[in-house]
Regions:
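Accessory RNA-recognition modules of RNA-modification enzymes
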Residues: 1-264
Length: 264
C-alpha cells in the first residue's frame, strides 16, 4: 500500500525492492508496472519461456516453482477467510513438474497484410497477439501443433476468417477446434483434412464452430471422442468446449486423494 491505497504492481514479487511507474490510477486502487528491480526477491528466477515478458498466457514464471505453489495455496486460504470460512485441516498442496503439463490452449488468430497468419496468445492487457513459436508449458504433442498452425491455416479458403483455435490433447488423440466466420463447404473439407494430416503427422481430430453455434461440430470421419484417464479404471470422454482440468497429472492425483479421504 502507498499512503493507505492499494497498488498492484505487475511483475513484482513479495519481499523485493523495486522502482515502478503507474499505468492506471483508480479511485480505490492503482495499477503499475516495474521499471527496475533494485533488490530481487529470493524466489525470483529467470522465466523459462522467451515469450514470458509479452505473452499474457502465464504470469508467475519469474517465481520459483515451489513458491508458486505456496503462493497459490495462500491465495485460496485468504479467499476462504474473506468469505468467513476457515479450513480445519490444510493438506499439503498437490504439485507436479512446471513444464510440459498443460493439455489445452486457446490461441488467437489474425491474418496479416501479407496473407500470413499470426497465431499465439494475447499480449497481457492488450488485444495484440504475441506470435508463439514455442510454449514450454504445453504437453506433447501440442507444441508441434502450435508450430504447424500458421502453415495449415494458409490452406484454408481465403474468405474464411478464423478467430480462435483451441488445441486439446487427449490420451488417444489431439484435437484442433476452430472458431471461424463460416463453415467450410462440403467440397472444401477433404483438402483441409488432407493438409491437416500432412502437417500433423499423427492422429488428429478437426472440430469447427461458426456463427451463433454453441457446440463444436466434428469434420473428420472419426467416431471416438477425446478421452482421458482419471483413475486406472475410469476414463472419461469429452469434446472441445467441455471443461477438463488442464493438468492431467494433477487431476489424477486430486481424484486419488479425494477417494482416499472417503470413509470406508
Amino acid at each position: 500500500r502507498i499512503d493507505g491505497k492499494a497498488c498492484f504492481v505487475k511483475g513484482a514479487l513479495p519481499n523485493e525492492t523495486i522502482e515502478f511507474r503507474y499505468t492506471n490510477r483508480k479511485r480505490n486502487y492503482d495499477e503499475a508496472r516495474i521499471t527496475k528491480v533494485v533488490q530481487p526477491s529470493p524466489g525470483r528466477v529467470e522465466p523459462g519461456c522467451k515469450h514470458f515478458s509479452r505473452c499474457g498466457g502465464c504470469s508467475l514464471q519469474h517465481l520459483d516453482h515451489q513458491q508458486q505453489v505456496e503462493f497459490k495455496q495462500q491465495q485460496l486460504l485468504d479467499s476462504l477467510s474473506r468469505g468467513g470460512m476457515q479450513a480445519e485441516t490444510v493438506l499439503p498442496p498437490i504439485s507436479a513438474p512446471p513444464w510440459g503439463y498443460r493439455r489445452r490452449a486457446r490461441l488467437a488468430v489474425q491474418r496479416a497484410k501479407d496473407g500470413k497468419f499470426l497465431v499465439g496468445f494475447r499480449n497481457a492487457g492488450s488485444r495484440r497477439i504475441e506470435p508463439i513459436t514455442q510454449c514450454p508449458v504445453l504437453t506433447e504433442p501440442l507444441p508441434r501443433a502450435v508450430a504447424l498452425l500458421p502453415v495449415w491455416l494458409s490452406y484454408l479458403p481465403s474468405d474464411i476468417r478464423v478467430f480462435e483455435v483451441e488445441l486439446i490433447s487427449g490420451d488417444n488423440s489431439i484435437a484442433i477446434a476452430v472458431e471461424a466466420s463460416r463453415f467450410p463447404a462440403d467440397e472444401e473439407v477433404p483438402a483441409m483434412l488432407d493438409s491437416l494430416v500432412k502437417e500433423a503427422q499423427g492422429p488428429v481430430q478437426l472440430w469447427w464452430k461458426a456463427g451463433k453455434q454453441e457446440r463444436f461440430s466434428r469434420l473428420d470421419s472419426g467416431t471416438d471422442n477425446l478421452c482421458f484417464a482419471v483413475t486406472d479404471d475410469i476414463s472419461l470422454r469429452f469434446e472441445p468446449g467441455q471443461f477438463i482440468q488442464v493438468n492431467g497429472q494433477i487431476n489424477r492425483e486430486m481424484v486419488a486423494q479425494m477417494l482416499s479421504l472417503l470413509p470406508e
